Amino acid sequence: MVWEVKSNQMPDAVQKLLLVMDKRAPGVSDSLQLLQCKETLPSSPGYNSCDEHMELDDLPELQAVQSDPTPSAIYQLSSDVSHQEYPRPSWNQNTSEISENTYRENEVDWLTELANIATSPQSPLMQCSFYNRSSPVHIIATSKSLHSYARPPPVASSKGEPAFPHHWKEQTPVRHERANSESESGIFCMSSLSDDDDLGWCNSWPSTAWHCFLKGTRLCFHKGSNKEWQNVEDFARTEGCDNEEDLQMGTHKDYGSDGLKLLSHEESVSFGESVLKLTFDPGTVEDGLLTVECKLDHPFYVKNKGWSSFYPSLTVVQHGIPCCEIHIGDVCLPPGHPDAINFDDSGVFDTFKSYDFTPMDSSAVYVLSSMARQRRASLSCGGPGGQDFERSGFSKNCGSPGSSQLSSSSLYAKAVKTHSSGTVSATSPNKCKRPMNAFMLFAKKYRVEYTQMYPGKDNRAISVILGDRWKKMKNEERRMYTLEAKALAEEQKRLNPDCWKRKRTNSGSQQH
C-alpha cells in the first residue's frame, strides 16, 4: 500500500491534503488486508465524495512559506574537504569565458582559508565554550601580519622613552587575563580582541607575561635585590606598580629592551616536569644575566630569524606556531620591538605552508591544517575546482620547490640528527630508518642518566629499567614524547612515503 500526498485546488485558493490510497496490487498476501481502510468519511459540504479520496477537514490550512533565495554558507566535510570561500558559479560553457580578473578580485590566501574553515560549524574552535562572545571576530590576514606579536611598535611617547616597554605595561593586564582563558585550554583558539582589531590579524597566540616569556616561566636574576626564583606572573605584577620605593630599589622595566641573547641552555627537572634552563644576556653589564626555566615547547621570536623553539614539533602542536630551531647566540625580542616584524615571508611562514599534519591529535591546529591540506590535494589532482585552484594563490604556495621545501627538509634533517640512536650506519637513498617512537625518545633522553645511576648494568638491563619507569608514568608525562614522535613520523612519512612499506625480496614477490 502506497500513501501519497496530493494537493487539490479549492475554489477559495486554499490547499488541503488529500490522502490517496491505491488499491492493493495483485500478488500481495492476504495478511495485509488489515492495512486497508474501507471506511468512507463524509467530505466537506459542497464537494463530491469518492471512495478512493478522504478529505480531512480538521487539518490546519496550509500556508505558503517564502524561502530565502540567497543560499546560505554550507561547509561540507567529505573526502574533498572544502568550504565556501565566496560565491562562485559552477563551471559550464557560459561561465568558462569569464575573465580571470573577476576571480582574482575575490582571491583569498592561505591564512584566510584556515580562518574560514576555523569558523565553520564543524570546526573544533566553534565548539569551545569560551569562544561564544558578544563581539564579532574580524579576520583579515596576510603573511605580513602572521602574529600579533610581530607588530610595528606603537607611537613613542613625548618623554622620548622607548615605546615597547610602555607597551608591555599597558598590555600586561589584558594579555594576562587572556592567557588564563585561552592558553590553558591546550588548543589553538581564536578570540575577538578589541585591542588588536587594528592589526588586521585577531588570532590569539600564547600571551607573554613579561618580556618574551609566557605564563608559567620562572625567573632568577643574577643581580639586584631579589636573586630568588620567582614566577614571571608575580614579577610582571610587581613591575606594573609605580611605587617610588620600587623605583628606588631598582626595577627591571628596561631590562633587555634590545633583546636577550641566549648564552647557554640545558634540560632539567623542576617540580617533576622536564623544563629548559636558559641563560640570557641583556646586553648591559649593570643589569646582569638572567636564568629562566620554561617549558620545552616555549616559542621565542628571534631577531632576523622569526619564530624559533628548541622543540619545533612540540611548539606547533601546543601553540600552533611553526618554528625554526633556536641556537646559542640568538637574540630573543620582546613584543612591540621594532625588529619583531614578520619580515618578507620568513622561513617560519614557509614552514607553516609546507608542514604536514594529521587529525590524530585533539589539538585544533591538527584538524584545521588537515582539512586545508585535503582540500588543496583534491583540487590539485584535477577535482571540480582544479581550474580555480590554478588561478588562486595556493598554487604558487604549494608548488614552489623553494624555501618551503628547504625549511621543512632542514628541520627534518636536524631532528633526525638530534634523535638518532645506536651505531651510525650508512643508509642509501632507497633505504631510510624509521623514526623513533615515544618510548625510544624517552629512553634516549634518560639512558645516560640511568646508566650512571646503576653502574655495572649492561644496556639490556638499563632498557628494562627504563621500560618499568615508562609504564609508571602518567599520560600527561607521556604526552610530550608522544606528540614529538607523531610529528617526526609524519614528517618522515611525507618526505619518504615508501619507508613505511616493507619490500619483499623473495622470488615469489618479484614475479609480479
Curated annotation (Swiss-Prot):
GO molecular function terms attached to this record: DNA-binding transcription factor activity, RNA polymerase II-specific; RNA binding; RNA polymerase II cis-regulatory region sequence-specific DNA binding
Annotated Gene Ontology cellular component terms: nucleus
Keyword Ubl conjugation: yes
DNA-binding region: 432-500
Alphabetically ordered keywords of this record: DNA-binding, Nucleus, Repressor, Transcription, Transcription regulation, Ubl conjugation, Wnt signaling pathway
Gene label: HBP1
Domain AXH: 201-343
Main location: nucleus
SMART domains in the cross-refs: AXH, HMG
Regions annotated as coiled coil: none
Biological processes per GO annotation: regulation of transcription by RNA polymerase II; Wnt signaling pathway
Maturation and modification: Ubiquitinated by the CTLH E3 ubiquitin-protein ligase complex, leading to subsequent proteasomal degradation.
Species of origin: Bos taurus
Compositional bias (Basic and acidic residues): 167-180
InterPro entries reported in the protein's UniProt record: Ataxin_AXH_dom, Ataxin_AXH_dom_sf, HBP1, HMG_box_dom, HMG_box_dom_sf
PANTHER family, A to Z: HMG BOX-CONTAINING PROTEIN 1
Keyword DNA repair on entry: no
Stated name of the protein: HMG box-containing protein 1
Cellular localisation: Nucleus
Function: Transcriptional repressor that binds to the promoter region of target genes. Plays a role in the regulation of the cell cycle and of the Wnt pathway. Binds preferentially to the sequence 5'-TTCATTCATTCA-3'. Binding to the histone H1.0 promoter is enhanced by interaction with RB1. Disrupts the interaction between DNA and TCF4.
Record note on quaternary structure: Binds TCF4. Binds RB1. Binds the second PAH repeat of SIN3A.
Positions of region (Disordered): 151-180
